[in-house]
Structure formats: C-alpha cells, structure tokens
C-alpha cells in the first residue's frame, strides 16, 4: 500500500493460517470508497470467509511471528551455505 497499490491480496492459506487447514485469502483496500464499491459484490456473491474458517485462520495467526522468524533464519543459513559453495 505504501508503494501506491489500490488493493493488496494476501494468502491466508499459506502464511497467516500456517497449518494447511484453511483455504482463504484477503483483500486490503487503500480507500474506504473502493472498499464500499466492492463490498456489496463480495457479500452477495458469497466470497466471504465462513466464521469457522475465520476462527481457524485467527488461530494460525497466533504463531505467524514465530514461523516467519524461523523461515527467515533458515533462509539466511541456506544463503550462507550457498555463498560458500564453489559451483554457485
């Protein structure tokens, strides 16, 4: 959003949920006007998350910081290893 996007889409399934037990995504809007224009369609077409799936995603979000920290740490270790590899 800070780079000028009107809408940002996030995969709740992969990152926020984190346990492969929910299929969801979310849209973040940079203005309430754009949100209001699309809300009716989102609501009436049934493209909103169910209460149970929202709870599952919320449960997974509680470990997001820990999982992201571990993923970053692992990526750094892999990068260090690859940096020293003679064929790379």
Predicted regions and their residues:
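Conserved PLP-enzyme active-site core in the AAT-like
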Residues: 1-85
